C-alpha cells in the first residue's frame, strides 16, 4: 500500500464471527498484525463492523468489542497510535449494513443503539447503507428514519458492488452527484464506493452467471474519475483482497494449481499490480497532486470520440467561464465535398474528455460576410476572435 500510494484500509469484523471464541481469536490476530504494520508503513487503518447476520440484542456485543479494541490499541490517543483513522477530530468506526430491505433480523432500532453507543464512547461514525438510501426504494427499506440515522453519522458510504457495469455506470454517476448534494445539505460527508469488477466464480463455481467484466481496468477507472468529477473528497475501494467475489485489487497470480475447483484470475494482458497502480494514480488525483486523467490507457485504435461522421479543418478549442472545453469545428457535412469547402460550424463540449455534448451547428457560410457563396470560410481562429462571446452565450 505504501509502494502504490494507497492511503489505508478498513478492517472488517463480522458480528457473526466475533460472537464465538474461535472467530474472535482469528479476527483479533489479524487486527493485531494490521495495527502493527499500519504504523510501521504509515498507512491509515479503521475498524469496520459488518452487521450481516446480527441478531437483535447483539448491539452490546459490538459496543463491548470496540471498547476493548480502543483500550488495547490506544485508539483515542493519536500520539500512541498515529495510524488510526480520525474524522472530525475523533477516532472513526464504520458500521456497515444499515437500511437494506433483504429481511435482516436487526433493523433501524438496533442500528440507532449502536450509533448512539459509539458516539457516547467518543467515536465518529461512518455508516454503510444501500444504493438507493436517498430515495428509500430499490434495495432500501422505505422507513424515513434511515435519513435520521444518517444525519447522526459523520460519513455515509452507499454499497454499489454488483449494481452496474461499465455500460450502465453513467446513470449511477448522476446518482452520486445527487447523493453528494444531499449530503452537503445535511452536513454529512460522503464516500462513494467503486469496485473493479465482480464474479461469483471463485465461490460458487464457473457456471454461475453473475459476472461484471473488469475490462482491463477501464471499468474501475471510469468509476474513479466519475466519483472525482462528481465532487467526491474520499473514495471507498471494494475490495483490497476479496477473492470470493472477484473484487480484489491486490496482486494475484493468473495461473494457480486448482484441481477440479474454479479460479477466476486477472485478465490476460495486465500486470499483477495493474489495479494497485490505477487506485494509486486515482489517489494522487483525489489529493490534487496531479490533474484528472481521462483514460486508464489510451487505445490508439479507438475512433475519434466526437467527430466520426464529418470532415473538419482547423478546429479550435476553448475553455469558457463554465469550465467546459468547447471545440469549434468547421465542416462540410451537408453534403460532404472536401476539406477546402467547409460551409458550416459545429460545436462540441466536454468536462472530462470522455463524455461529449453535441451542441449542433451554430452558423453556416451564407450567414456571415466572410463566407463564400460556393462554401468555405476564413480561418476558424479569426472567426472565434470576432464572435466567441456571442457563440458562447448561445450554447
Report residues per predicted region.
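Carbohydrate-active catalytic/glycan-binding domains of CAZyme proteins
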Residues: 296-395
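Glycan-processing catalytic domains of CAZymes
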Residues: 2-295
Amino acid at each position: 500500500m505504501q509502494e502504490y500510494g494507497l492511503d489505508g484500509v478498513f478492517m472488517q469484523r463480522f458480528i457473526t464471527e466475533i460472537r464465538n471464541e474461535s472467530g474472535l481469536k482469528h479476527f483479533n490476530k489479524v487486527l493485531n498484525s494490521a495495527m502493527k504494520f499500519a504504523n510501521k508503513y504509515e498507512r491509515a487503518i479503521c475498524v469496520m463492523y459488518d452487521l450481516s447476520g446480527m441478531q437483535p440484542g447483539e448491539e452490546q456485543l459490538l459496543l463491548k468489542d470496540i471498547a476493548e479494541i480502543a483500550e488495547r490499541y490506544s485508539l483515542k490517543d493519536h500520539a500512541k497510535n498515529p495510524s488510526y483513522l480520525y474524522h472530525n477530530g475523533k477516532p472513526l468506526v464504520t458500521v456497515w449494513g444499515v437500511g437494506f430491505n433483504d429481511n435482516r433480523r436487526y433493523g433501524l432500532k438496533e442500528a440507532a443503539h449502536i450509533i448512539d453507543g459509539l458516539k457516547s464512547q467518543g467515536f465518529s461514525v461512518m455508516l454503510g447503507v444501500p444504493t438507493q438510501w436517498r430515495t428509500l426504494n430499490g434495495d432500501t427499506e422505505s422507513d424515513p428514519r434511515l435519513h435520521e440515522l444518517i444525519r447522526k453519522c459523520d460519513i455515509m458510504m452507499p454499497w454499489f458492488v454488483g449494481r452496474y457495469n461499465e455500460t450502465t455506470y453513467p446513470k449511477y454517476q448522476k446518482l452520486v452527484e445527487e447523493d453528494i448534494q444531499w449530503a452537503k445539505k445535511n452536513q454529512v460527508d460522503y464516500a462513494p464506493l467503486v469496485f473493479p469488477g465482480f464474479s461469483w466464480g471463485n465461490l460458487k463455481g464457473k457456471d454461475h452467471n453473475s459476472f461484471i467484466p473488469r475490462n482491463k481496468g477501464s471499468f474501475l477507472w471510469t468509476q474513479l474519475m466519475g466519483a472525482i468529477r462528481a465532487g467526491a473528497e474520499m473514495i471507498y475501494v471494494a475490495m483490497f483482497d476479496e477473492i470470493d467475489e472477484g473484487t480484489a485489487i491486490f496482486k494475484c497470480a493468473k495461473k494457480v494449481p486448482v484441481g477440479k475447483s474454479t479460479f477466476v484470475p486477472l485478465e490476460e494482458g495486465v500486470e499483477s499490480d495493474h489495479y494497485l497502480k490505477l487506485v494509486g494514480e486515482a489517489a494522487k488525483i483525489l489529493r490534487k497532486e496531479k490533474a484528472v486523467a481521462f483514460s486508464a490507457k489510451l487505445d490508439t485504435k479507438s475512433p475519434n470520440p466526437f467527430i466520426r461522421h464529418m470532415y473538419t479543418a482547423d478546429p479550435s478549442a476553448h475553455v469558457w467561464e463554465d469550465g467546459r472545453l468547447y471545440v469549434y469545428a468547421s465542416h462540410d457535412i451537408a453534403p460532404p465535398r472536401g476539406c477546402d469547402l467547409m460551409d458550416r460550424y459545429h460545436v462540441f463540449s466536454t468536462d472530462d474528455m470522455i463524455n461529449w455534448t453535441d451542441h449542433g451547428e451554430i452558423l453556416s457560410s451564407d450567414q456571415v460576410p466572410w463566407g463564400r457563396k460556393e462554401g468555405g470560410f476564413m480561418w476558424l481562429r479569426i472567426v472565434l476572435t470576432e464572435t466567441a462571446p456571442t457563440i458562447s452565450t448561445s450554447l
